[in-house]
């Protein structure tokens, strides 16, 4: 690792990039997503969308305010994008949602609607005055009622980030697995196994191909009977 860069061969496995074309790749800036669960905007634009051939051209495009992430202009080429973020390029009327594939890597799926985003509640914080702060998987924080539980998901209207819908984490919920050997698979929660030890809870998920079990923290609620946002196919 060197300053704002890291070696391509050491880049997270979630990044769908070639490893031997050059030695270095931009390191994502600290922010909403971890390095393993996010990637720098320059990688998205240059390596995945191929809107330019090199970092200098990408920096120019970003400096001109031509790229939005979740409805907001982003100009830092190292800005971190991750799961269910939406990248928009108004000049070509294009929107893409970041999803995890069954290969364990990030993919960009074209979408027509960039006005909604699904977020997972990773934890809650009790504030003074009895207020509750929701902490979401993309770093968003917001004040809400205590009706929301950790591991539930909410649909946010973008770019104002206001809650529009709420999906509970429970038996029957439609979920996507975001990590592990079942990464990218979608199914319904059949059983939640609570472990009375330091080991993680597990979830049994049913799909048309059969049932499988995965770690609870790998599960992301995406709707009830069908995915609640574009770009995710059950």
From Swiss-Prot:
SUPFAM superfamilies: Alpha-L RNA-binding motif. InterPro entries: KOW, Rib_uL2_dom2, Ribosomal_eS4, Ribosomal_eS4_central_region, Ribosomal_eS4_central_sf, Ribosomal_eS4_KOW, Ribosomal_eS4_N, Ribosomal_eS4_N_CS. GO terms for cellular component: cytosolic small ribosomal subunit. It holds the Pfam family RS4NT. It comes from the Archaea. GO terms for molecular function: rRNA binding; structural constituent of ribosome. Residues 39-102 form the S4 RNA-binding domain. One of its GO terms (biological process) is translation. Keywords: Ribonucleoprotein, Ribosomal protein, RNA-binding, rRNA-binding. Belongs to the eukaryotic ribosomal protein eS4 family. This is Small ribosomal subunit protein eS4. It comes from Methanocella arvoryzae (strain DSM 22066 / NBRC 105507 / MRE50). The gene is rps4e.
